[in-house]
Amino acid sequence: MALNYIWFFFFIIAFAIALGKWIITGDPMIFKTITEGIFKSANDSVDLSFKLIGIMTLFLGFMNIGEKAGAIRFLSRLVAPFFSKLFPELPPKHPAYGHMMMNFSANLLGLDNAATPFGLKAMESLQTLNPNKETASNAQIMFMVLHASGLTLIPISIIAMRASITPPAANPTDIFIPCMIATFAATVAALTIVSIRQKINLLQPVILAWIGGISLLIGLLIAYLKIFLSQVQIESFSTVLSNGLILLIFLVFLTGGMYKKVNVFESFIEGAKGGFEIAIKIIPYLVAMLVAISVLRTSGAFEFITDGLKMVFSYFGMDTQFVSALPTAMMKPLSGSGSRAMMVDTMTTYGADSFAGRLSAIFQGSSDTTFYVIAVYFGSVGIKNTRYSIPSMLLADFVGIVTAIFVAYLFFGN
């Protein structure tokens, strides 16, 4: 029911702000701007769904080969000791373990194109165990909130954007560690929030061992990149690692399929058909969500909020540099492309190496696009009652935002 009220209030807030602008400033174009944005977002939603068809068919085709080759079962057995504690509803060795692990791994490496198909497959697997098909299960909520926290090891696209902006950042990779800290804080917050709600004990030895091990690996990788590699080498390493792993996954699935005497071509076609069906199924959910977000954005709601915050912090004599980057943080839960545009606008206006420019990049890398994730993932399996998933995601996003601000002042503050 939370999504119902949020969707409604997006329109109410946008209309109230637009009406205020028209009455106070006499802006005759505000309603035209909002209406044009509505129709553009509706068309963009359909275009986005069609763009997803190719990616979905590709990865679900290979995923089907991997399942028949036994790769997903192997991955499920590997992570079962850890995931069985976080997802107690799932039976041992369930395929959903492997699908979720593939999704988290793709997210970790910044492989958005791969993460979405793997995540949708995970939701489909979890839905088979869901007793109430229109209400999100505990396992689905845990998966969604962890996914939306957006734990990413190497923010490749953000580094590339900082390098390509005019003028470019002197050191595009200097936001690497701050991004890692912010997104890690958001993920830990997401895990803690849902675990408290679902009464999961995070102090179990297995959970502590896995979280400690993952934290150690991340720390060692960060140390290696910062101590032994130059800026150019870091960018090269990131590109080779992320793209090389995609090809390696495909090769492992194909080799495993041939070894198991699976007809890999027919298996690919069989799995790929599901990608088309899912992409078409999510169109209504995407249209509904992206139109509501467009209404809020084109009404000027973000400018209204940031101007108000700047006045409040100035009144108390506090530093307001971070406020200039807040539009990126506010847009990120709503729209990935919108927040990316906000980040570019901030870097163009203030400079890529300015405090606001760097902080906007950290905001962009600190979490995933919450409402897009809700629309696509829950929409793909027909979930209508998302229960407490949205408040949990937004709270984790808030932790990521606050952490990003503190980290930015720690690394780049004057």
Where are these regions (language model features)?
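Membrane-embedded alpha-helical segments and adjacent helix-loop junctions characteristic
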Residues: 31-128, 231, 260-349
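Residue-level preference for alpha-helix termini and adjacent loops
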Residues: 103, 108, 145, 153, ...
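Hydrophobic transmembrane alpha-helices of multi-pass small-molecule transporters
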Residues: 1-49, 194-280, 413
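Short hydrophobic/aromatic segments of transmembrane alpha-helices and their interfaces
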Residues: 97, 134-137, 247-248, 322, ...
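Alpha-helical transmembrane segments of multi-pass membrane proteins, especially transporters
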Residues: 6, 10, 32, 69, ...
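Hydrophobic core segments of alpha-helical transmembrane domains in multi-pass membrane transport
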Residues: 7-22, 56-64, 149-152, 156-160, ...
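Transmembrane helix-loop junctions in multi-pass membrane proteins
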Residues: 19-34, 67-72, 153-170, 196-198, ...
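Membrane-core helix-loop-helix motifs of multi-pass transport proteins
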Residues: 126-218, 353-364, 369-414
